[in-house]
Amino acid sequence: MEKIFYVRRNEFENSLCAVRTILAKYFGIQNPVILRTENGKPYLKDNAVYFSVTHTKDALFLAFCDENVGIDAEHTEKDVDFLPIIKRFSALERKEIVDKQAFLRNFTAKESAVKWLGGTLARDFRKLQFINGKISYGEIELPTKTVFIPLDNYIVAVTSERDFSNVETIIL
């Protein structure tokens, strides 16, 4: 039941409107009660469907699953000087980050893992490592898979215990 939605920012008033519309239209959940964890992660009161949302300047990306999920996206043309940033990454990660695209894969993988954890960037991002396609929190490898989905000029990372390799992608 894994689904990814790609929505232009101007299609909905805000991301919560997009979530409510998608839940009603694609999952038959009318008037969902959406709560937030202490760290701000939105969730359904009855956990019938798990979801994660990420924003870019021009788009929303939403992941839905019957298990916990995290999503992040970045525009591949984003102008970013990644060399000063990766100085804070582990030596093994720095070896893998050979160009901007590798940096964006690493960054989106880790941010989607933070969302899967229900954590915060400030607390958890630096504790995560993305090496050889696997995410670790400190010394512990997470029981997740991170899949990258190219959509237009975006790199979209989805982290879940489910395999999103053959995910249905819906463009609204």
Language-model features: locations:
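Core catalytic alpha/beta fold that binds nucleotide/phospho-ligands
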Residues: 1-172
